[in-house]
Amino acid sequence: MSETQVPVVISGAGPNGLMVACELALAGVRPVVLERLPAPSDEPKANGMVGQVVRQLDMRGLYQRFTGSDDPPQPAYQWIFSGMSVPLFGVPDNPMYALMMAQPRLVRLLDERARELGVETRWGHELTGVQTRSDGAAVDVSGPDGTYTLETTYLVGADGGRSTVRKLAGIDFPGHTSNTIARIAHVRVPDEMRGPNGGIDVPGVGPLPFGHNRLDNGGFIYAEFERERSMVGTIEFDEPGDDLEPMTLDELRDSARRVLGVDLPVEPPLGPGPHALRRIAGQNTRQADRYRAGNIFLVGDSAHVHSAMGGPGLNLGMQDAVNLGWKLAATVNGWAPAGLLDTYPSERYSVGERVMMHSMSQTALFGPGPEIAALRKLFNELLQQPSVAEHMAHLLAGSDVRYDVGSDHPLAGRLVPDVTLDDGRRVAEMLHGGRPVLLDLSGGHVGDAARGWADRVDMVAGATADLEVCGMLIRPDGYVAWAADSFEADDENRLHVALQRWFGVSRAERGAARRDGGLSSAQVAERTA
């Protein structure tokens, strides 16, 4: 059976796939999301988000929805790198934001938001085949009532590290697998072992802080979520083995004894669960050799996998989703300039490379041996230096990569500062609708010059002493496409170039070209470039 054409099919209803769906639906595009699981999974995975993605959630009104607070996000004053503290108190424009939330709850909330926006998520429907065409793809699906085919213009693979979409698209996944075994479980810890600030005091070892701890015989991880449920994990290096037999709590106890040198008196957690109890044999660090194959795109773990140390996964994957989402929507809606979709892989690939670099570095610094111990002492000294801490904050937050947007202004290519205008409006609130914003701080001159794009770009006039610019053009993903400190004739020309580069030609030019020859927005852009 073949169904009616749908503009976009998304394979995978995890955080990344659902975020793409929400971005499309905000722009009036209704995707179909396919998920092989019959319902959202309660399996414990990530425990929160860090970095730029927290601010992007704020730009959609989701941060407030997720936290139940009207307050904007605040940066963390400390983070970790391979278990070593990175003090961030003195970092200017600190980009390290954090939102602690279990991944199952995140998926439920994003699914709820997607349904509100009109997204159809088909739980229990698995993508099994793809036949590519010049204008899209035919997607084979296996569902509860049998098999069927969806015709689509675009296909997004958000189906994890073993991505079916990636394999069917013929996209290679090169990388490295390390010889480590990680074991993780939710447990109950005796009250007398609970240390200050969320740490644990292990008899015979002493206090160990919250998070990753490197010891002579491996790594020990501790995180307390609630009184009757803590997460305990171990990392052992150069240990061969397989991942065939189910993980047991006794296996974790044995591993903890090898790492700590003492028994760890933990018991199963109370409550219905589900509770984490898993083993990860080998740590994969891999990146797809390309994020796009024709009309097929990869986001999140489908495009890259890496160590979870430092928590970069959702920051990387959900930013992929927001970057791709608005560009796909612009293309489906007919106003995307030529080459807009090509900027998705060109912008996001290098960000993935940076995450793999620092996650592999953290894993290496967690390894055994006196040489690594000496190297960690050196790193600990360096991390106390303000300039090093600032560099690490931007690396871990993902704000060290600047997109090439065709402008050399210091703000261009970076996430927009969340300033508050004199009338109380925050820049993040202006982006709740997922549309581009032209912020006019010139008294009206900037906005007047861009009236031809008012059907696609929200014009916002205001004043603030917190920005020394007369205007900024902000993409839907929150990145600055153009900014100017003054607004002379050359600045107006550069604004028009930026508007056309990211949001197509003006309404008048598009209408005239279509009357003359029925051209698409991309064709109009090519003729007027």
Stretches with model-predicted labels:
Residues 17-18:
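N-terminal Rossmann-fold NAD(P) dinucleotide-binding loop
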Residues 4-6, 145-154:
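Core beta-strand elements of the Rossmann-like FAD/NAD(P) dinucleotide-binding domain
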Residues 2-7, 11, 26-27, 83-85, ...:
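Helical substrate-recognition/capping region of FAD-dependent monooxygenase/halogenase enzymes
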Residues 281-298, 302-304, 412-433:
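FAD-binding beta-loop-beta segment adjacent to the flavin cofactor pocket
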Residues 42-117, 213-214:
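Active-site-adjacent segment of FAD-dependent monooxygenases/related oxidoreductases
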Residues 25-46:
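Glycine-rich FAD pyrophosphate-binding loop
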Residues 154, 158-279, 288:
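Conserved FAD-binding catalytic core of PHBH/FMO-like flavoproteins
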Residues 123-137:
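A conserved short coil-to-beta-strand element within the FAD-binding core of flavoproteins
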